[in-house]
Regions:
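Helix-to-loop junction immediately C-terminal to a conserved catalytic motif
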Residues: 73
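Conserved ABC ATPase signature
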Residues: 158-162, 166
Length: 292
């Protein structure tokens, strides 16, 4: 069944066949609203992100995609509604949480690397600033994280010496770096959030980034039992306009329009969906409910 509901319908969207209803809900938004001045950006958005999912958030420009990503990441507070993290309502921002129950990694559209720092210093920035780990241990974690994204040996370079695609991968390495190496540590699972990760990249560089996102997730899912392998990238969420990312890097889609969730479905259903707003977005037609 195609998961959809009409614009403005208060009923919950039907669940996609891609969803595993038995998987734990890691993040849930309930009737989230957010305005900036008089501009309403989110107008009652509700959806769930479950463990194991690769989710794309799509929709035309200005429909609240990046805003909802930042609210999920705990970087922005909603005006109304609830953000529930593994069954526990979040109060305040991520930085206010004393005992987080889910690690969140954020990869921004611009990569957001500090030009005056080396790649290694960028990747390990949080550890250098906020941990008591020895420098040699941090350097080891930096090398491990860079190796995961295919950037071994670049830690002494500066961002200006990297291509656009390499900068995106360095930003991902920063998002997934381990924060604690204690043998008795019970590492948190992580949800990685990408804000238009392939924007500005050529098709080949885009494919590299898309496959990397998928591979990091797949490697963690390869161990079927949660008890066997704690930590790792449990799920990821991508805000994107790119059809290649929709088809290559995600399994389920959430379509935002006018600050509401108007359709949910699989990436396969996206190509055949007859919902007018989805069809217009998929085909790039000027005719339809999306007005420019």
């Amino acid at each position: 069944m195609v998961a959809r509901r009409a614009i403005g319908d208060p009923a919950e969207a039907l669940k996609s066949e891609a969803s595993d209803d038995n998987a734990e809900v890691l993040i849930e938004l309930k009737n989230v609203r957010k305005s900036f001045g008089k501009k309403v950006v989110l107008d009652g958005a509700s959806f769930k992100i479950r463990r194991g999912e690769a989710v794309g958030i799509i929709g035309s420009s200005g429909t609240g995609k990046s805003t909802v990503l930042r609210i999920m990441a705990g970087l922005l507070q909603p005006d109304e509604g609830e953000v529930i993290i593994r069954g526990r309502p979040r109060v305040g921002l991520l930085s206010d949480e004393k005992d987080p129950n889910l690690k969140v990694g954020m990869v921004f559209q611009s990569a957001a690397l500090f030009d005056s720092l080396t790649v290694g210093e960028n990747v390990g920035f949080k550890l250098y600033e906020h941990s008591d780990l020895p420098e040699d241990v941090i350097k080891g974690l930096i090398q491990e994280s860079l190796a995961q994204v295919g950037l071994s040996g670049v830690e002494d370079r500066y961002p200006a010496q990297l291509s656009g695609g390499m900068k995106k991968r360095a930003a991902l390495a920063r998002a997934i770096i381990k924060e604690d190496i204690s043998e008795n540590d019970n590492p948190l699972e992580e949800v990685v959030m990408y804000d238009e990760p392939t924007a500005g990249l050529d098709p080949v560089a885009s494919t590299v980034v898309e496959d990397l996102m998928r591979n990091l997730h797949t490697e963690n899912k390869a161990v079927s039992s949660y008890e066997e392998k704690k930590g790792g990238v449990a799920s990821y969420i991508v805000v994107t306009h790119q059809h290649s990312t929709i088809r290559r890097a995600v399994d389920r889609l959430i379509f935002l329009h006018a600050g509401k969730v108007v359709w949910e479905g699989t990436s396969k259903e996206f190509d055949t969906c007859e919902e007018p707003i989805v069809r217009q977005f998929a085909t790039g037609s000027l005719q339809g409910p999306i007005v420019y």
